[in-house]
Amino acid sequence: MHYVNVTDNQSSVMRLGGLATCKVLKDAGLTPIFQLTCRDRNRIALQSDLLSAAMLGIDNILCLTGDHTKLGDHPQAKPVFDLDSVSLLHAASLLETGKDLGGNELVGEPPKFAKGAVVSPCSDSIDAQLVKMERKVQAGAEFFQTQAVFEPEKFIKFMEAAKQFGKPVQVGVIIPKSAGMGKFMNNNVA
């Protein structure tokens, strides 16, 4: 294992914060990828969390829009979605230049991130995913992770088309441990 993904209240279910988890993993000698979603925080809080991550030496980030709160364990919570995954990537890239989204100069050394994004290679429209991938590359994505791949033929076709971007793609593979786990994923994972 080279990296450990640390989710951001995955499936809109409240859990321990990702930044604290990343710090614990880093202190244990692991390399975390800090996932940030736009669902729960506005642009001020997202930029603050990015700077906090950099201060703690957590430089691998995965920028996601996030699942709607209606899907989770607090469906009455108000989603934020001030930014989306592309604008969050742009914000991280801008912070690396020493400025924030408000045009303000940062104090001290600008952060440096390995910026990642998500792509869904098995969606109905590969072309739409390639357009999204291109927008994410233009915003600063340096690597991609796929959503779980269950259709190898679609994945192979997608990967052929995605070569044009020259970015590494980490494949999402989920191996159900039981039939019950498979049923749970089918019914509960967004």
Q: Which residues make up each language-model segment?
A:
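A generic, well-ordered mixed alpha/beta core segment in the N-terminal half of proteins
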Residues: F34-C38, N42-T69
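Short, ordered loop/turn segments at secondary-structure junctions
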Residues: D8-N9, T37-R39, T65-H68, V149, ...
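Active-site-adjacent beta->alpha loops and helix N-cap segments on the catalytic face
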Residues: S12-V24, N42-S48, H68-N104, I126-A128, ...
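Hydrophobic faces of well-ordered beta-strands that scaffold small-molecule active sites
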Residues: H2-V6, P32-L36, I61-C63, K115-V119, ...
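Acidic (Asp/Glu)-rich catalytic clusters
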Residues: L19-G29, L50-I58, E105-G108, E134-V137, ...
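Active-site mouth loops of central-metabolism enzymes
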Residues: Q10, P32-I44, F113-A128
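Catalytic-face loop-and-helix region of soluble metabolic enzyme cores
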Residues: G172-A190
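Active-site/ligand-binding-proximal alpha/beta "capping" segment
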Residues: A91-Q138, E142-F144
